[in-house]
Structures are given as C-alpha cells and as structure tokens.
C-alpha cells in the first residue's frame, strides 16, 4: 500500500450517502408537534425519501450542475435571436425531482399530492424546501417563484388569464409545465422598487413593455411576472403595476425581449440569472392599475420565510458536515468529538441551527392560521 493510500485512511468522510431526514431529530420532533397524525403518515415517507436523495443523488447532481453552469446561446444557426439557455442534464434531472416527483411548486395549490385529499398546509411546503436545499440550493429559487407566482395569479389574475396559464403552471409533467420567474430588479431599483423605470403602454387588450431588468433569475422561464410603470402613473411605488409576460406569443413566436447576458455569480451557479431588455414585449395586466406593489407584498411573507428556511437548511448541512468529521476524525488516539474544545465549537453551531429550525416550523404552522 502506498503512503498516499495510507494517508487517505485518516481523512474523515463527508455527508455523502447520509439521509438528512433520518438524522434530524429536531425536525422529526417538530413534525410530530405541528402536523396531524394522518397527514404525517402521508408525507413522512416522502420526506424520508427526499432526505435520502439530499445526501445521495441530489447532492451528486448539484455538484455536477455547479461545475457546468447554464450557457446562453444568443442566436440559432440561421442567425435568429432566440436567446436559448442550455442547461446541463444534471439540472434537468433536479427539476424533475423538484417539480415532477415532489410537486414542490404546487403542493399548496392542488389536491392529491402524495394522495392527500387537500392542498398541503404551508408548513409541509417549507419542510420539503428545507430538505431539498440541503442537497441543492440554486433550484429552490425558481421553485419558490413558481409557488408564490401561483399565489399571486390565483388571487389577482383575471379569469381569462387563469384559464390560459394556470393549468400548465400547476402541472408536474415537465413536458407540459410552464415555469415562472419574477423580474423586479433594475439598475436603480433593487430594494427601492419605487425607482423602477420599465414602462408599459396600452395596446388594445394587452400592453407593450420597454426597458431593462437587471437581475432576472430563472431567465428562460415560460411565464414572467414583472413590475412596470404605466404612462402617466405617479412616481414611486404607488405608480407600479403587475404584468404577466409570456416567453412565447400566441402565434408561437418569441416575445419581444432579449436575454442580454447571464450573470457570473459566486453562488447558485446551477440556475440561470440574467439581464433582460424588453423591446415592446407583450404583457397582460394582473389586477388593477397601480396596485403592483400591493400585490407583490402579499407574497413577500412567503418569500421571506422561504429564504429563512434556506438559511436554516444550509446551517443544518454545515452542522452535519462538522459532526461527520468530528465523529470520524481521529487524533491523539481518539475521535476529535471527544475533546471539550471541539464539543464547544459544535455546540456553537448546533444551538443557532436548532433555533432556525424551530423558528420556521412555528412560523410555517401559524401561517395557515393567519391565512
């Protein structure tokens, strides 16, 4: 045996192969406290399956997708401006898991997911996000945008728009699914959305939208929800309206906007975020004029909690990795978890991790009561 091979025996294992549900006793206790027994009997086997995927196939796919980020192809071979985005097959397989097998985008909007006769309560959605993110972080942004976009559409869109778009937005068949994106940010309008400059002008039964959106995640989604200012609207956030912009027009042609480039990001590398220029893009008003900020704020609580869940999930993954090393790394004749200073460091990780878990479990539970 070579010296290099012998040295490898000293390296502690990582979380590969771990079931993130099975090892999380805090999560299991919270589920028992907040979910009724009949619902637990339905969802816990699925949570266990996702937990196993999180430390297995999903983790493998995530690593591959991060090494092979999406690629923008501005034109086709004939010179047509199509701005197609090429995703690695690993990303497409993760989409199949999230949208297809686990229906994470729609479980709170349709009956029958996993055989449960009602739409799932919000807490179930957040638990699935928590387990999924421990294996893959980037894709949960598009999944969450689809979920909150469905909430907005169901509450605010006209019956005509609902009939046209909701069936495919609610699908879990990847050949039928229309994914959702939300284009809000501009160069001068990040947190201060009142600075939005993208303009919309009425044209018959639709609107034509012009301007630049600066940070557009899930840039090649089939359905886009965006904020724009109509002609003559007041300045600031009170003059913003919400529009649905389809990727393709009714005649099958591409809508009039361009994905100018993709962002070179430090994180969420698997998911395509881009800069978009709208040049007379066809859009449809959602709700009443000048109520866009009110509409989007109604989904902000969902998004905020989702971001908290993602943070809790990453904290848990980091804790799992630390525990795995501490329990298996041997120094001075014993596993380093036996050393008091190591235990102290682990406790400094463990306490806020359990607090984050407890926070989102409680908040997700009372969200159903608030609704």
List the predicted regions and their residue ranges:
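Short Gly/Pro-enriched turn/cap motifs at secondary-structure boundaries
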Residues: 188-191, 215-217, 234, 265-271
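A glycine-rich, basic-preceded beta-loop-alpha segment at the flavin cofactor/substrate interface
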Residues: 117, 251-256, 260, 272-303, ...
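Extended, charge-enriched "interface" segments that sit outside catalytic cores
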Residues: 1-117
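Extended amphipathic alpha-helical segments enriched in small hydrophobics
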Residues: 304-370
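A short core secondary-structure module
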Residues: 206, 210-254
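N-terminal leader/propeptide and maturation segments of large enzyme subunits in energy/redox metabolism
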Residues: 35-58, 117, 123, 140-163, ...
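Internal helix-loop-helix
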Residues: 83-176, 217-219, 357
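Internal maturation/activation junctions in enzymes
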Residues: 157-198, 202-205, 361-371
